[in-house]
Amino acid sequence: PKAIALAEGLLGLYDYELKLHSQVCGQLLHMHMDNFAARLDRQNSFDELDYDVDPKKVHRFVVFLNDWSMGQIWHQGTAVHTHWKAGDIISWHWQDFPHGTANMGWDTRYILQYTGRTTDKTWDFINNTTKDSKHKLNIHKE
């Protein structure tokens, strides 16, 4: 229920897919560009879908579930992200930015990855959120 409230209430997504990722010491996800081949509507094909023509129809958000630990990195374009806090949310224009992750540290890094169709609420959230924005997210307690 909390994951649904976040997707629909705060991010304004619908027809979304939610994945829990864990990255342990020594794992990396090489730099890549998303094409959403694994989305259920694409069914691992390279058929052109509406969001290939208009990428704003689908967006991806990542929610960090635990605080950053030494040795963990998140790379997007020319930026390297570290020092995140549990509950921090990042997103990017999936069709334009190469990205990847690595965990050289001792602690496992956990994220929730939302990929879904956008609404006006999604774009309001994106356009009115900065790196300093604060949103009330209670993802750890009942």
Spans of features found by a protein language model:
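Extracellular structured ligand-interaction cores
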Residues: D15-E17, G26-L28, V58-V62, M70, ...
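Short, solvent-exposed loop/turn segments at secondary-structure junctions
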Residues: C25-L28, N35-F36, W68-M70, I89, ...
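A short secondary-structure junction signal
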Residues: H30-D34, D41-Q43, Q72-G77, A86, ...
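A short beta-strand-loop-beta hairpin characteristic of the jelly-roll/cupin
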Residues: K56-K85
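Short beta-strand His + acidic residue motifs that chelate non-heme Fe in jelly-roll/DSBH
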Residues: G71-I73, T82, W92-G105, Q113
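Active-site or metal-binding loop neighborhoods of secreted/extracellular toxin and effector enzymes
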Residues: R117, K121-E142
